[in-house]
């Protein structure tokens, strides 16, 4: 008996529906969901990228609290390239709640919420709640198409992207939720439209075949009773798209495929043609206008381009409005601007970022797409997903955004985290031993009867992939949640305590090396930009008493010389103006030996001692040297006193190596020259 292969993904929506909804136990998912919440409260001290603070918390906190903040260049009023509305919702709303709760918690419990922990926690709780919306959308899509939602929810929730990235105040995390929302509403419209179109085509056929006028009237009335479907959820989809574009203009890459699939629903039928396609496109644009106008007005008012006085006097022109996505495109169109952020090869997303973010799942996705391209080149069209199917939607939503974003030479892993959603839907069953409908292949016998065959890989092979998935995500979750630049936030908490405990007139100076920028909003520095009025109606401004010098990856000799000059200036200022000071230097433990050596060679300049240690702290910019890591040498060498000494030496090397993954805070003290010391003693 010969069998003709028929691709499972080319079936209609009715073929996916089960006779009765399958209820699956998802206890493991709830455990992972609880873990996501617990890690949000922990809190995660890992520092993924400066943008999680400097494009959200640092921008908004100054609008809600009387503190000094340093808004990044993206929010410069002269040429803003980021919209303010989304950060005001994601961070501003939690901060408004925090501000109102703080007096009550202090009154009833003696606990103030004006601490770095709560400044970080409240926005992250909001983001954590948003992240669960994407879980819900994944569940609904699986349920709608009769798919195994358990295996997908567990895979989705166990990804370190959801445990770390999704709960941070990154615009990319919001992009992930918006992409999931688009896919849900589009897939719902596709399922609904396919049913209506099939019924419409069936009734049209019966109408044309009707022998009598009575039958034609009957089928005509039945067609008229069919519900409308062409413009379903149009306003919702348009609004989500506009929000996504004003959040990150790169959202166009993620919205392109879902919106295209929504526009071309039913195009292979007799009742839907290009006229419907163009009508949908026109109405979609119209539905997006209210949201676009709203965002433009909000940004124009916030950045000072538009005022109520100008509106009252009708002095309004085109220059009174700012469109931040347009400014964003203008900025990124210039390669010279991207050079300051770092230029990368165009294949970085495919070769590095996808495996890094999605590990096993990403590799499976890339291999599957490669097979599809091979099938397309061989004109094996039945091996490709049907354009009208949910699998076609998810496949193109995975690959097209990555291709479009690869055009830009600046590529970071976080740029493509929204493709986790389609990846999980498509390939999560590959990691599980539980069969899923979307990996069933159907064959048609010579007599026309269909048979189903479920190719199940060997359990051992699948269990290896599943084990690799869990282990890699566990390690990466720990790395990004606690280890990567993990000493920065504890350092901020320490400096905040130091600023509150110091004498009133004392100035604090802080140098940092090989670490990300400290979010100054968390330090709650007193506002030096605001003009205050005294009780006698005198105007005054506060003096800046905290000074930060971020040295980045500058060579330590340069940093050493800068510290020497700074402490000399501070000492002279203390002698002349009687302004006391404290000077600190934060650097990775892997750099302390070099700094100590520089200090010993220039012992007449200053001295230092260790104040605090923050662990773990992994700085990719200054990893410990492997030359001091003599494990292999000790294991392969046999000493006179036996192998036990080699094991002890190896353990000591490992301990010393791990100990270098710390952030050290040094206090720098001025060293009075001997000649001056002698004069003082006399």
Segment roles from a protein language model:
Residues 37-42, 53-81, 85, 89-106, ...:
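Extracytosolic helix-loop segments that constitute the early lumenal/periplasmic catalytic or substrate-binding loops
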Residues 49-51, 167-174, 412-413:
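Short acidic/glycine- and proline-prone juxtamembrane loop motifs at membrane-interface regions
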Residues 242-342, 346-347, 351-366, 405-408, ...:
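Membrane-lumen/periplasm interface segments of specific transmembrane helices
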Residues 97, 121-148, 181:
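Transmembrane-helix motifs of polytopic, lipid-linked glycan transferases
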Residues 172, 253, 346-367, 389-395, ...:
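Hydrophobic/aromatic-rich transmembrane helices and adjacent perimembrane loops
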Residues 433-590, 604-615, 660:
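Membrane-embedded, lumen/periplasm-facing catalytic core of multi-pass transferases
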Residues 553-558, 562-682:
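Aromatic/acidic, Gly/Pro-rich catalytic loop(s) in extracytoplasmic/lumenal soluble domains
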Residues 184-241, 253-292, 376-381, 425, ...:
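Perimembrane helix-loop-helix junctions
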């Amino acid at each position: 008996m010969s069998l003709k292969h028929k691709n499972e993904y080319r079936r209609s929506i009715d073929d996916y529906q089960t006779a009765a909804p399958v209820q699956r136990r998802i206890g493991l998912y709830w455990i992972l969901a609880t873990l996501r919440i617990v890690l949000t409260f922990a809190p995660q001290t890992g520092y993924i990228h400066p943008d999680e603070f400097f494009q959200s918390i640092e921008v908004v906190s100054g609008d809600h609290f009387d503190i000094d903040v340093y808004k990044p260049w993206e929010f410069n009023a002269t040429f803003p390239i980021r919209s303010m509305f989304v950060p005001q919702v994601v961070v501003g709303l939690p901060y408004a709640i925090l501000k109102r709760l703080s007096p009550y918690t202090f009154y009833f419990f003696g606990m103030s919420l004006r601490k770095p922990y709560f400044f970080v926690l409240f926005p992250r709780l909001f983001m954590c709640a948003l992240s669960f919306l994407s879980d819900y959308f994944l569940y609904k899509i699986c349920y709608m198409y009769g798919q195994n939602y358990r295996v997908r929810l567990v895979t989705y929730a166990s990804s370190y992207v959801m445990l770390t990235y999704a709960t941070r105040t990154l615009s990319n995390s919001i992009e992930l939720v918006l992409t999931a929302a688009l896919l849900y509403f589009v897939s719902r419209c596709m399922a609904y439209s396919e049913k209506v179109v099939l019924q419409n085509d069936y009734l049209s056929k019966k109408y044309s075949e009707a022998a009598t006028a009575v039958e034609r009237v009957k089928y005509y009335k039945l067609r008229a009773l069919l519900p409308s479907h062409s413009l379903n959820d149009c306003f919702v989809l348009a609004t989500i798209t506009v929000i996504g574009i004003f959040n990150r203009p790169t959202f166009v890459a993620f919205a392109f495929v879902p919106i295209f699939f929504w526009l071309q629903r039913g195009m292979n039928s007799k009742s839907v043609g290009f006229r419907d396609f163009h009508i949908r496109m026109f109405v979609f644009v119209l539905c997006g206008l209210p949201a676009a106008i709203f965002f433009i007005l909000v940004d124009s008012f916030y950045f000072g381009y538009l005022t109520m006085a100008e509106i009252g006097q009708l002095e309004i022109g085109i220059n009174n409005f700012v469109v931040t996505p347009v400014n964003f495109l203008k900025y990124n169109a210039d390669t010279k601007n991207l050079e300051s952020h770092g230029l990368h090869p165009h294949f970085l997303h495919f070769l590095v970022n996808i495996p890094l973010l999605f590990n096993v799942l990403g590799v499976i996705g890339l291999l599957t797409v490669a097979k599809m391209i091979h099938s397309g080149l061989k004109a094996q069209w039945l091996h490709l997903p049907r354009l009208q199917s949910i699998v076609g939607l998810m496949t193109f939503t995975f690959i097209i955004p990555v291709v479009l974003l690869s055009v830009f030479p600046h590529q970071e892993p976080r740029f493509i985290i929204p493709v986790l959603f389609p990846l999980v839907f498509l390939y999560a069953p590959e990691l599980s031993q539980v069969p899923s409908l979307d990996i069933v292949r159907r064959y048609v016998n010579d007599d026309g009867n269909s048979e189903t065959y479920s190719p199940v890989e060997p359990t051992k092979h699948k269990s290896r992939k599943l084990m690799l998935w869990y282990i890699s995500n566990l390690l990466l979750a720990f790395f990004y949640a606690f280890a990567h630049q993990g000493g920065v936030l504890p350092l901020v908490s320490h400096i905040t305590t130091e600023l509150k405990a110091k004498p009133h007139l004392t100035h604090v100076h802080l140098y940092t090396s090989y670490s990300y920028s400290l979010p100054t909003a968390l330090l709650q520095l007193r506002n030096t930009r605001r003009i205050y009025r005294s009780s006698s109606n005198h105007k005054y401004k506060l003096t800046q008493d905290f000074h930060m010098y971020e040295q980045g990856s500058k060579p330590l000799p340069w940093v050493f010389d800068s510290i020497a000059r700074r402490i000399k200036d501070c000492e002279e200022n203390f002698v002349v103006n009687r302004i006391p000071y404290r000077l600190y230097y934060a650097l990775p433990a892997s750099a302390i030996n070099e700094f100590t050596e520089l200090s010993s060679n220039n012992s007449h300049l200053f001295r230092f001692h260790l104040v605090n240690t923050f662990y773990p702290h992994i700085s990719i910019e200054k990893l410990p040297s492997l030359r001091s890591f003599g494990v292999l040498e000790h294991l392969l060498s046999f000493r006179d006193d036996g192998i036990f000494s080699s094991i002890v030496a190896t353990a000591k090397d490992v301990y010393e190596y791990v100990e270098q993954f710390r952030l050290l805070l040094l206090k720098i003290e001025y060293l009075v020259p001997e000649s001056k010391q002698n004069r003082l003693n006399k």
